[in-house]
Amino acid sequence: THATDATNASRTMLYNINTNQWDKQILKSLKIPSHILPLIKNSSDNFGKTHRSITGKSYPITGVVGDQQAATIGQCCFEKGSVKSTYGTGAFVIMNTGPKKIYSKNRLLTTVCYRLNDKSTYALEGSIFIAGAGVQWARDKMKLIKKASETEKVVKSLKSNSGVYLVPAFVGLGAPYWDSKARGVLSGLTRNTGPKEIIRAIIESTAYQSHDLFEAMKKDGLKPKIIKVDGGMVKNNWFSQFLSDVLNIKVYRSQNEETTALGAAFMAGLQ
């Protein structure tokens, strides 16, 4: 079966979210023949069966959905205005905007959240390039810690950030800035600054970037009341609380760490 769903198709930049088809103009400009592209289906649909040589038995494939969209579904963000944010290497915030597309005036992305019964539910999305990757940098490059799990103990040992801040633009900045030329800045350093202060600045920077994303959403007329979070970074209790404080929003942390797999299972189970 040569097929995909609308959420994955929308990631190719070849998909027209208005017509729910491959964009003819883009394909023509890039000289891509439409017949080589997969059929676009609902997120819950018949995608064929697995081959016995791989899975032992032939099992039906009834759910296909993009990574971040699957996490949104797994977090049960089915209502308009519901938000999930995944904090892994990067961070990805997705807000369900319902059956109507909202085109951001504040540099957020409009995408497909999921598609069922030939009807799309849309979302606004913002991407943070460096979240947990900042902790990896501190561990692997700067040798400030040995394990990522040490960060919670480190930040809790400090009464404040001592005026030390990090702009983690190691690979540019994502939404809402979209500046590929931006580079990282560590400011407020004094002779008293040590590894602990830098670690705290790294952890705090993800919350501050999240604040910028949520402010963009508010300017687009959407004010979330809660945020559902998952990913490796939110295992840090201090970060989860700091995130809530910075955003001034209640943060709900999923007990299920595999929300992406759960969302895909939800889609499969609808068939």
Feature locations, PLM:
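Gly/charged, well-structured mid-domain segments that form the phosphate/adenylate-handling core
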Residues: L39-N46
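Short acidic capping loops at alpha-helix termini that bridge into adjacent secondary structure
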Residues: S34-I36, K225-I226
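Active-site core segments that coordinate phosphate-bearing ligands/cofactors
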Residues: T1-T4, N8, M13-K24, K28-S29, ...
